[in-house]
Amino acid sequence: MLDEMANRLHMVKGVASAAHPSRLDASVPSPFATELIALLPRLRRFARSLTGSADRADDLVQAACERALRAADRFEPGTRLDAWLFRIIRNLWIDGLRAHGQDPSRHLPIEAAEAVPNADGPARIEATLTLAKVRAAIAELPEQHREVIVLVCIEGLSYRDTAEVLDVPIGTVMSRLARARAKLAEALGTTPDQMLGDR
């Protein structure tokens, strides 16, 4: 799937280049495209946390990559490409929901747990069941809490980068994260101290 997305990205770059040759041939440096391709698994994971669907997530990531490639000349070197792309994905998702008359704040599920790598036999089954419980608990969180958990605890963004992606103050990120951890801890029968780590 990721190879297919990388091929799509190369195709998108070619199509965008043909549409705007003066902007993209010179302005989309190879390192930009290379880093963008390397981020595809993380972008897809974030998009899936928003959409609840692998197919819709792939469409969202493709649209975000197209937009990023068209705007590559506006990307500021030295800033985090991942945070910029997460923000593009989130904004496209919200715009899409609004275009279809849906409320972006409504609950959208996260897909069922994927297989757990590097585990076998009973350990794999237990880890997969635990992952399924965690994903189900995350899916039950309000959207604002789910976004913060995914960006900070799963994608590894700092509070500052998460605040930038979500366009909220850092204090809001911290309070949403604390509430999300408390709700997850309650749902999983543990304490917030044992929840996912900080960045």
Model-predicted regions and their roles:
Residues 59-66, 79-91:
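Structural recognition of an alpha-helix C-terminal capping motif at a helix-to-coil junction
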Residues 74-76, 87-108, 127:
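Arg/Lys-rich amphipathic alpha helix in sigma70-family domain 2
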Residues 148-152:
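A short pre-motif secondary-structure segment
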Residues 24-34, 44-63, 71-77:
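Short, charged helix-capping/linker segments at alpha-helix termini
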Residues 1-38, 97, 105, 111-124, ...:
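Intrinsic, short, N-terminal disordered tails of RNA polymerase sigma-factor systems
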Residues 39, 176-179:
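Residues within the DNA-recognition helix of helix-turn-helix
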Residues 61, 177, 184, 188:
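DNA major-groove recognition helix of helix-turn-helix
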